[in-house]
Amino acid sequence: METEYADVTGHDVTTIICLCGNTVDGEGLIQANSEGIPVHGDDSTPVPAGLAEWPEDEDIYTLCPKCGRVYRDAVIEETGTAPVAFRVDAASGPVAEAIRIHWEQNP
């Protein structure tokens, strides 16, 4: 299977236009870990159940909650391209629950 690529401007992960059409300003994109689980980015509060801790190695991914495509931020920042790293089930299961929790924490 060929690698899919999202559109991105420069080397800026906040400009990703996911293959499904979602953007940061659309339905939103979420910072995630290497398993596609949304991470808790506020180190002043405990990590809510269901979310992942911020990775110690700072290896962050961007999750599209609309379609489940996941992009590796380091690749985008280094190459200016946004290949899909992998996909997760954003509609059901633990990732879907983590997405729900993320939006509750970040309305």
Region annotations inferred by a language model:
Residues 2-9:
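Short, charged surface segments at domain edges that flank catalytic/cofactor-binding sites
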Residues 53, 59-83, 87:
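Acidic, low-complexity intrinsically disordered segments
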Residues 42-50, 61-68, 94:
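Compositionally biased, non-globular sequence tracts
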Residues 32-44, 79-92:
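Short cysteine/histidine-rich metal-coordination sites, predominantly Zn2+-binding motifs
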Residues 15-18, 62, 90, 101:
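Intrinsic disorder/low-complexity segments, especially N-terminal tails and targeting/processing regions
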Residues 48-56, 93-107:
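Short Fe-S-cluster ligation motifs
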Residues 12-55:
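Short recognition patches in nucleic-acid-associated and regulatory proteins
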